[in-house]
Structure formats: structure tokens, C-alpha cells
């Protein structure tokens, strides 16, 4: 999807120029007021930008130069709002069929089963939990067979138990539904669990975009992460299980591997691992007889000094991937680190979550 639009919204000057992939989940991330919801309202056709161009695949949705503007009902885009917006006088069945101008019983059954709402079909919205309402809203959006699904902070209005109830269904959506999803959120946890791609926006502008691993590990993202969330995301391939201990070896490249807690995936499957920057220390000499199980040879790509905190952020290259380490200014001076140096990264902890997303 190609987006190049401008719009004046009160004090916000929206100026977006970005390409979104046509597969997987793309997270739109930013603080409140950054322009996240304004962007997807433009994509859906609910609002018209002042100028620009939008295409979805080969279809042009908006072109100010040629006076093209497809209304929402002709865009084939599903939209799930923060609040479910179900019709209270319709049953779940009635809500699911509303706006669906084609009948495909198999597609209906597949969506209902995927979202686990078979037992809700004859109930009314007033009897549903917040998580159940959102599942119905997602089902309604998917039943029109959209070319793209927009989700505007679908968990924001839910309490923690309802979020935990809905999250597994969103994870299944990411795996089972062959529809690109644009997912607006300000939750780092949701990004880590769901997103394949990421666009970070601030004050109506795109700050950085790309694969979620690369954006998460970018220098632009660092100021947005709380100290406890400063980390790297790496994609690794499952290799083997340790014959004695509950550990699995995963490969980052042909000569770089990590030991992680035992996973259920088969050899050759890909998983995502997360390494906190504060769990990475550096040494110029390969350590011996150490309790740390994961030691990687790395090359320093960037050195970012934060004088106020007496801290240094080091971006390391390990094969084709990157890893961040936070060390003290004292340690950096004593090791006399500079860009291009080879060092050994000692990794105290590596996490892998239950659904391959760290």
C-alpha cells in the first residue's frame, strides 16, 4: 500500500509518505495525538486528505491530482474501532451479517470458528463481555472479505482480563488470515506479540518504518523505550534441543547461535527472541569458565553516549543482525571502544514467548 498524503488537522500538520506491506500485521505506533487514528481514518475513507495519493495493490483509492476519491463502501477495507460499535437490537448473527452483501457459508463458519464465537450467535451485545464484543466486531470486518483490515487500538478500552482473553485470537489472526492488517497502538507489548512491520509516527510525520526487528533496534526508537524495555529483537532458526538440559539452540547465522529455554517448535522453524540491552556486557577477550551460556563475537557499528546518565549505548553487528548493549561511560572509556572494533557480547538473558514472539 502506498500512502503519500497531507492534511491540516487543527494544530497537527499530517504529512505521511510511507509504503505498507501487503501481508502480515503492520503496527502504527506513536504517542496520543501523533496522528495514528487520523491516518487510518484517511485510509478507510472516513476522512479526505487535503492532497496526495493512496493506492492499495493496483487500486487507486485517492488521487488529488486526478480527483479520485473512493468512498468507504467501495474500498473493501474492514475497520475495527476501539469500541466494538455493535448494533444493540441485532443478535451476534445479525451483526455479523450486517453490511455483508455476499453469502459464503464456508467463509462464515471459518471466521466464526477462528474467533471462537459459535456459542454467541444468538446472544445480544448487551450480554457480551468487552472481549467478546471485539471478537464479534473483528468477525464482522473479516466477513466482507476485505483487501485490508484496519484495527484502531482494539484492546485500549478493555481491562487486563479482557485483554488477556482477546490477545490469543489476535495472535491466531496474524497466522491464519491472509489479509494485511494495519494495527494502531501505543502499547509496546502488543507490538512485540503481534507485529511483523512497524511504522513509528510523531507529530503527524513518519519517524521510522520497516521490519519490526529493525525498527525496534533503530536509534530513532531508543528514546521511545523506557529503560526497562530497551532491548533487541532477533529472528533465529530452531536447531536442536540440549540432550541433558531444558534448553534449545537457535541459530542467528551459520556461526552464531544462542541457547534459550526449551521451545516446542520443530528444527528449521523461525522464532523471535528478545534480549534486553542491560543484559548484554562486553569484553575484548573471549571469556572462559563463565556461567554465562551465550557469548557472541560482534563488531561495533555505533556508539551513542548519553552524558547525563553516564551511559553508553553500543550497537553491535552479529552476522546480519544487530544487538544493543548498555554499558557505563567508565566501562566504555576503560575498554577504549570505537566503531569497527571486535568484541565479545556476553548475554545474561534471552526471552522467547509462547507464540514465537518475544
UniProtKB/Swiss-Prot annotation:
The keyword Nucleotide-binding applies. Keywords: ATP-binding, Cell inner membrane, Cell membrane, Membrane, Molybdenum, Nucleotide-binding, Translocase, Transport. It is a peripheral membrane protein. GO terms for cellular component: plasma membrane. It comes from the Bacteria. Pfam families: ABC_tran, TOBE. Residues 289-356 form the Mop domain. Residues 3-228 form the ABC transporter domain. ATP binds at residues 30-37. GO terms for molecular function: ABC-type molybdate transporter activity; ATP binding; ATP hydrolysis activity. Its EC number is 7.3.2.5. Its main location: membrane. The keyword Membrane applies. It catalyses: molybdate(out) + ATP + H2O = molybdate(in) + ADP + phosphate + H(+). It is found in: Cell inner membrane. The complex is composed of two ATP-binding proteins (ModC), two transmembrane proteins (ModB) and a solute-binding protein (ModA). Belongs to the ABC transporter superfamily. Molybdate importer (TC 3.A.1.8) family. Part of the ABC transporter complex ModABC involved in molybdenum import. Responsible for energy coupling to the transport system. This is Molybdenum import ATP-binding protein ModC.
Amino acid at each position: 500500500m502506498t500512502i503519500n498524503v497531507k492534511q491540516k488537522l487543527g494544530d497537527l500538520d499530517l504529512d505521511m509518505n510511507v509504503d505498507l506491506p501487503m501481508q502480515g500485521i503492520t503496527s502504527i505506533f506513536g504517542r496520543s495525538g501523533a496522528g495514528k487514528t487520523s491516518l487510518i481514518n484517511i485510509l478507510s475513507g472516513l476522512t479526505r486528505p487535503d492532497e496526495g495519493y493512496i493506492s492499495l495493490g493496483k487500486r487507486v483509492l485517492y488521487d488529488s491530482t486526478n480527483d479520485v476519491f473512493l468512498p468507504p463502501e467501495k474500498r473493501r477495507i474492514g475497520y475495527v474501532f476501539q469500541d466494538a460499535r455493535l448494533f444493540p437490537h441485532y443478535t451476534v448473527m445479525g451483526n455479523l451479517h450486517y453490511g455483508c452483501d455476499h453469502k459464503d457459508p464456508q467463509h462464515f463458519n471459518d471466521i466464526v470458528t477462528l474467533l471462537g464465537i459459535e456459542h454467541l450467535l444468538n446472544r445480544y451485545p448487551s450480554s457480551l463481555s468487552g472481549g467478546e464484543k471485539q471478537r464479534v466486531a473483528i468477525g464482522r470486518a473479516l466477513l466482507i472479505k476485505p483487501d485490508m483490515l484496519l484495527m484502531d487500538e482494539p484492546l485500549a478500552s478493555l481491562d487486563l482480563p479482557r485483554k488477556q482473553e482477546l490477545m490469543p485470537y489476535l495472535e491466531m489472526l496474524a497466522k491464519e488470515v491472509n489479509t494485511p492488517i494495519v494495527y494502531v497502538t501505543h502499547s509496546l507489548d502488543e507490538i512485540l506479540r503481534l507485529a511483523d512491520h512497524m511504522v513509528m509516527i510523531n507529530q503527524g510525520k513518519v519517524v521510522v518504518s520497516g521490519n519490526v526487528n529493525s525498527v525496534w533496534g533503530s536509534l530513532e526508537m531508543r528514546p521511545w523505550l523506557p529503560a526497562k524495555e530497551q532491548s533487541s529483537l532477533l529472528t533465529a532458526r530452531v536447531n536442536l534441543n540440549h540432550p541433558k538440559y531444558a534448553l534449545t539452540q537457535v541459530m542467528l547465522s551459520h556461526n552464531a547461535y544462542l541457547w534459550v529455554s526449551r521451545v516446542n517448535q520443530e528444527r528449521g522453524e523461525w522464532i523471535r527472541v528478545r534480549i534486553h540491552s542491560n543484559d548484554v556486557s562486553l569484553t575484548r577477550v573471549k571469556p572462559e569458565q563463565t556461567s554465562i551460556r551465550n557469548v557472541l563475537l560482534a563488531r561495533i557499528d555505533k556508539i551513542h553516549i548519553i552524558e547525563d546518565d553516564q551511559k553508553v549505548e553500543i550497537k553491535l553487528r552479529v552476522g546480519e543482525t544487530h544487538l544493543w548493549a548498555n554499558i557505563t561511560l567508565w566501562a566504555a572509556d576503560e575498554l577504549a571502544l570505537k566503531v569497527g572494533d571486535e568484541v565479545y557480547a556476553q548475554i545474561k538473558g534471552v526471552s522467547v514467548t509462547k507464540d514465537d514472539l518475544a
